[in-house]
Amino acid sequence: MNVFLSKYVNGVDKKSRVSVPANYRAVLGKELFNGVIAYPSIRNNCIEVCGISHIEKLRQMIETLDPYSEERDAFETMIFGEAVQLSFDGEGRIILPQSLMKHAGIEEQACFVGKGVIFEIWQPQNFEKYLNAAQKIAHEKRLTLRNAH
């Protein structure tokens, strides 16, 4: 399967290492880089994580914007300027930079949330709050999926 699915909570050790779920690593196994690209989410207080191929798609989308626009500059700065390449160690762990941990409020535990082409890393209690709000929105907007093609 080529999508990130499910939710997992893993511990973060004193060296800021956290194990990426095995099925997420399997999806990323098709990438040229043995690791992930992580950057602060521009939507939520979490970390967005993907492979090199998705970063390339984001680059292509951003390049369609006017090169001198405020929006393009903001997206380039927040996604590419803040992104870090994180390699897997022999045990499938990555080291989360302090700046990303602070952005997401992560300390001792990290909640991995599959979002299809990307996954997010949350502070577990913050994700539970978000999940409650997302459930309400999904329920209210459920009919919009019927028209999606």
Curated annotation (Swiss-Prot):
- Coiled-coil segments on the chain, per record: none
Major localization listed first in the record, in broad terms: cytoplasm
What the entry lists under InterPro entries is as follows: MraZ, MraZ_C, MraZ_dom, MraZ_N, MraZ_sf, SpoVT-AbrB_dom, SpoVT-AbrB_sf
Q: Where in the cell is it found?
A: Cytoplasm, Nucleoid
| One Gene Ontology term from the biological process aspect of the record | negative regulation of DNA-templated transcription initiation
May I have one GO cellular component term? cytoplasm
Tell me which residues make up the SpoVT-AbrB domain: 7-54, 83-126
Q: Which GO terms describe its molecular function?
A: DNA-binding transcription factor activity; transcription cis-regulatory region binding
User: Which keywords does the record carry?
Assistant: Cytoplasm, DNA-binding, Repeat, Transcription, Transcription regulation
Q: Which cysteines are joined by disulfide bonds?
A: none
Quaternary structure and interacting proteins, as annotated: Forms oligomers.
The UniProt entry's sequence similarity note says: Belongs to the MraZ family.
UniProt protein name: Transcriptional regulator MraZ
Per the UniProt record, the source organism is Rickettsia rickettsii (strain Sheila Smith)
Q: Which gene encodes it?
A: mraZ
